[in-house]
């Protein structure tokens, strides 16, 4: 007969050992989030495509949020891996997923609704929500003026929460939330008159106003708010504590302020250059560097006046300028480009011009053979400005739209779409300030035409010196920019 008591001596030791193992294993803590990040050697971060957060340009990855979080990853001694979210809901849903991002760095503002999903770090930037309207339209002055206006904001944003609260007081306020756009799209829609108003943070306005000349700030909607990073909800404070310590450190040592100055501290818009000013620059600045333009242009088989026009557009023929993104010198070379072109000192005008000439020739050589002159030159200039990857994206989009990807006239219509989510989401290299290369090329072509004209033997000398220079119209819709020193 089966007897349970007969089994007890046989399995007693096994049961005791098993129970002891389970008890001990329960006492072993799993690695916390910070420990896992260090063990993996990777900090996974989710963000948004925006000039104020993260995007890729000819310098590579850049943006205020990117630089701030890259320094954090460097402090941890790990690699930074960036992922971009399709919209705000997607961003918050990604944080804390298994093998997913452990941190969201995207200019986020805390709210009671968001605190149900994530936990926020200490603040690193103060921003103010601003109502944006189109110049020439009636300017709203208070919340009551929002009634009857066509308004759009990002879905899931704190701005949508603000409008929802206002609607309780002003039931006539109507607004649309969209997850198919980004802030740049909203500003463009106001600029083009597609919507009447939008609500965005002041830092986004500062970063984008130069590209959308029709937008204006109507008024601030509420007080300044704090932007923070976000981590997953829960009781594991390891990563959050490390983030707060890091943000406190960069606040105290000045790193944070330097980043703020780089991205938000300058209104680096030159404005329209009149004939007299341009003539003065031709007389006072160009002669210092003309021999270098001619020598290196000849060596690289490009027109020296085209090379000089690039230098004027980039720096106004000033050798010691540095932009907010770190490009430097007369030809405004990135560090990577300078190294690749054999430039050891970007502030040396001779070296800078040499690097610019080699880089322009390199850009032309990289283009498909199907692109013929003069389009080949304009494509090379666009690649010089925005990078060959984004240019290739625009050419592919042009082909899909039934346009000729080898003609600048067609591709320049497509490039601005790279700043619109519905288009850049379909590309390999993502968001770009696609309007910049269009204006870059247009201005250089005009400067080139001017230089070609005034450097004719019969026009050199007195006419330029006296300022008797007829300057063809420079694109006023997108002024040239003079990089401001850090």
From Swiss-Prot:
Membrane topology note: Peripheral membrane protein
Primary location class: membrane
Any GO MF annotation of the entry: peptidoglycan lytic transglycosylase activity
Compartments reported by the entry: Cell outer membrane
GO terms for biological process, alphabetical: cell wall macromolecule catabolic process; cell wall organization; peptidoglycan catabolic process
Catalysed transformations (reactions): Exolytic cleavage of the (1->4)-beta-glycosidic linkage between N-acetylmuramic acid (MurNAc) and N-acetylglucosamine (GlcNAc) residues in peptidoglycan, from either the reducing or the non-reducing ends of the peptidoglycan chains, with concomitant formation of a 1,6-anhydrobond in the MurNAc residue
Family classification: In the N-terminal section; belongs to the bacterial solute-binding protein 3 family. In the C-terminal section; belongs to the transglycosylase Slt family.
Functional summary from the UniProt entry: Murein-degrading enzyme that degrades murein glycan strands and insoluble, high-molecular weight murein sacculi, with the concomitant formation of a 1,6-anhydromuramoyl product. Lytic transglycosylases (LTs) play an integral role in the metabolism of the peptidoglycan (PG) sacculus. Their lytic action creates space within the PG sacculus to allow for its expansion as well as for the insertion of various structures such as secretion systems and flagella.
Protein name: Membrane-bound lytic murein transglycosylase F
Organism taxonomic ancestry: Bacteria, Pseudomonadati, Pseudomonadota, Gammaproteobacteria, Pseudomonadales
